[in-house]
Structure formats: structure tokens, C-alpha cells
Amino acid sequence: MFSEIIKKYDIVTLKDSGFLRGDWFIGSALMAHDYESLKEGIYFYPQETIWTRILDLEYINPYWEIYNQTYNFLLVNKQDSLAMNFLTSLLREIEVISSKTLDFVVITSNEHLIRNLIDRDYYIITKEIPFFIENSKVGNYFKIFVKNGGQFIPIIDCTEFKIQSKKYFEININKFYLKLLDYFLHGEIPEKFKFFGNTSNFNIESLFLEFIDSQENIRVVSLLDCLIQLSSKNIEISGNYKGHTVKKILKKFALYSVITKLDITKVNH
């Protein structure tokens, strides 16, 4: 995926460093690399993260997940015009992948981006979403959705920021968001929900929309998916941060297994 864009823009590919860093989990793709040491250019890297901040959210949506896989692009000290052209190239590529012309909705306060995208017939919502590093505002987020009937499906998160006179433009594309987009467009159910259906003997194929209408169902599937990934790295309960996090996830999984009546004895990962 994105191989033609990577070639066209002479993009440097960085290694996926996994979701572990010592005794901590990597919670955002930006944490995975020393971005301040990168030279001017465009970089691409796939990245796994464990996003523990959302564990205690009271209200969630179908896109809620703890373990994430993302495609990431980072533009360092590139002109706004190149960044905007690059972003629209990515949106066109997503349309090719989806085999459909998509209605994009962009939430941003970037005036250059607004002028650029209005000409391309994208729908713009003007709103500032500040981005902070260590409690200091260094830039802004903006978000891109696909409008599909009455649904708004998140597809890309972007961050623009400056640190020590260097300008960064980060683009995150969550693989799970693409899979849910594929479901809403073509009916293909994401793999982690299929696995849950097989594990719990639930006919998820015919009841998927009803299933994801329940926050409890979404929680238990994503908790299970995260535990499977942690198990693959042999991460267990212990006295450090990672071990405490595993314990917390296990307790929540047990709780929502009871609520959703999942027989956890059938889970063999």
C-alpha cells in the first residue's frame, strides 16, 4: 500500500519499532522515532501502538481500540504547497483502494489547506484543534472523515507543529479505520470482529451493525485484540508499568466478558 506514492515523492522508509520501549508502551506513532534528529525530507513508517489513555473513557464509538496499527508519513521542513499536494495524493490513493469516489470532510483551521481543498470540492469545517507537547502548544491537529450517507468515518489524522525552528507535518492513517470504511462501502467485516465471532459462537456476519451499536461489545473485542498482541510479546502481569497495564486490561476484559456473556475459556491466545 502507498508504494507508488513512496516512489514518486522519494520517501525514506523507517523501521517499525514495535509498541515497546523499555518498560513502557509506545502510545503514539510520533514517539517511535527521534523526529527532531531527522533531516529535511519525507519519511514513511508503519507503527504499532498501545493507547492506554482511552481505557477509562466512559463513552466510546465503533473506532475505539487500544492496540493500533498505523501508516505514518512525516514531512520535515517541507513547503505548505508540497504538503497539501502530498495529502491530496494520499486521499486519491485511498479512493483507489476503496474503488469508489469518496466525499471527504476536513476539520481544520489551516487557511492554506482550506483554500487548497475547497478548490477540490472537499467539505471544510473550520475549527482549531490545538496540539501540545509537554503542556506547551506547538501546533494544531486536523482530521479527515469520509461521509457515507449519514455516517462520518474517520480516515486520517494530521498534526502540524514547529519545534526549534523545524516544521513538521505528520499524517496518521489507522489500518482499522480503513477496514471499517471497507465494511461500510463493501460489507467486509474487520478481522478482529470475525475472530471474536468465531471465539464466542456469535453470528457476527449477519448482525454486525447491531453488534457494534453496543459500547460493551466494542470494548470486549478491542480488549481481546490488545491482549492477543500483548500475549504475542510474552508480556505478563508484573510490578512495572507494563505489568500493571496488562493487569488493568485483563480486569476490564473479564468485566466486559461477563456483560457480553463471552465464554473466556474459549479464548486460547
Residue ranges, per PLM feature:
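Active/ligand-binding-proximal structured segments within catalytic/core domains
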Residues: 68, 168-200
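Non-catalytic, well-ordered alpha-helical scaffold segments
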Residues: 44, 48, 65-69, 85, ...
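A structural-propensity feature for long, helix-poor, extended segments
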Residues: 203-237
